[in-house]
Amino acid sequence: MELSQQILSDLVTFNKYARFIPEINRRETWEEICQRNAAMHIRKYPQLREEIKQVYKDFVIPKKVLPSMRSMQFAGAPIEISNVRIFNCSYNPIDHPFAFAEIIHLLLSGVGVGFSVRKKHVDNLPVIKGPTQKNRRFLISDSIEGWADAVKVLIKAYTAGKSDPVFDFRDIRPKGAMLVTAGGKAPGPDPLRICLDQLRSILNSSIGRKLTPIECYDMCCHISDAVLAGGIRRCCFEESQVVLEDG
């Protein structure tokens, strides 16, 4: 590999894939990233231990062959806890109420999400009934699933006429706190709080009718803003669909 290519390769590696190791106050080296990835595969396929070790020694560490870079980034506990992290991209038409919760779950897992708000999809959504007069406290857990559940509970309250959730953010770690499982730093509760407020505002304005494509698009954008605030990848939107079918 030429020097210019090596420099570019190292920049991408240490910026996107190397975990910070608090005990020694530095990021992983390329060889350590490969060892973490190989160890995950060996735990999954112990009968192939020696073959995996040899492949990484002869091909992966010298960068002759590269595995899925998503698996290199999240190798270990993140993928073993939720294998959705190994996916690079996904697609989700907004044709059912829980699509919004699925989108935030995928985005927080590092998966790119393309979505469609074409009228033929959005027409499948139910009429927004609005929540009942009864409130209930919902404690948001400090996890990807916790954030996704908060969105799901809010949408369900408005589409199924359930009790109005009063969100409790006390368990979400403060901004800047270390994320142990996946690495990086926590965004704090504010991005999610803002997102839920924006979603609630749109839902309130559409009680008694179905959401329109532009409203669904706005909701997806508010969700992706919350995820971006945490330094995770964003949603994408197909340029050919910029003119929304908001009939």
Q: What is the role of each PLM region?
A:
Residues 1-247:
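Extended catalytic cores of very large enzyme megasubunits
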